[in-house]
């Protein structure tokens, strides 16, 4: 279950700020950035413009995908006995793709992006910060599970689906893991 607290360590605050910036500061064509441009053009204050962008980001077709990643990992943790067993993890990822488990949508959330097919630069930055946070907070095993899924998912997807451009983890993959940590 997601935990929201009243106070955060300096490292937690820094990583959370980084996650928000990486989600918001991303070119001019995505939904939340476009929303910011439209709302700002009305002459409103900065806080209102950022609030509008965050409201847009919350939508499931934009940044809300990170919530799906979070719940997918909660499901994986419940069903995978050995978090270090690549074969068991890959088999479960296949079941997700085949709509046999989790939300039965056939998607491994946090994988793939329309533009970033080799790697998502935002994800690379966020992953490093989340790794430091996981180590500091004693969530090394959780982080290792994320890394295993990140490594195995493209192989499983490539085996089950036709992938023309490649598939890599995106910024949503690690963004809500920090809330759990």
Question: What do the predicted segments below correspond to?
Answer:
Residues 1, 5-179:
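Non-transmembrane, aqueous-exposed alpha-helical and coiled segments at domain scale
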């Amino acid at each position: 279950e997601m935990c929201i607290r009243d106070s955060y360590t300096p490292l937690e605050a820094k990583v959370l700020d980084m996650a928000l910036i990486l989600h918001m500061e991303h070119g001019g064509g995505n939904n939340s950035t476009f929303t910011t441009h439209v709302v700002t053009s009305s002459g409103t204050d900065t806080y209102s413009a950022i609030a509008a962008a965050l409201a847009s980001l919350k939508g499931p077709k934009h940044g809300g995908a990170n919530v799906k990643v979070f719940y997918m990992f909660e499901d994986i943790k419940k069903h995978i006995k050995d978090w270090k067993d690549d074969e068991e993890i890959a088999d479960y990822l296949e079941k997700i793709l085949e709509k046999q488990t989790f939300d039965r949508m056939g998607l491994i959330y946090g994988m793939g992006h329309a533009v970033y097919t080799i790697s998502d630069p935002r994800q690379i930055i966020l992953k490093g910060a989340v790794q430091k946070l996981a180590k500091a907070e004693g969530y090394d095993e959780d982080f290792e599970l994320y890394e295993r899924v990140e490594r195995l998912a493209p192989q499983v997807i490539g085996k089950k689906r036709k992938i023309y451009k490649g598939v890599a983890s995106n910024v949503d993959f690690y963004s809500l893991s920090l809330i759990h940590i």
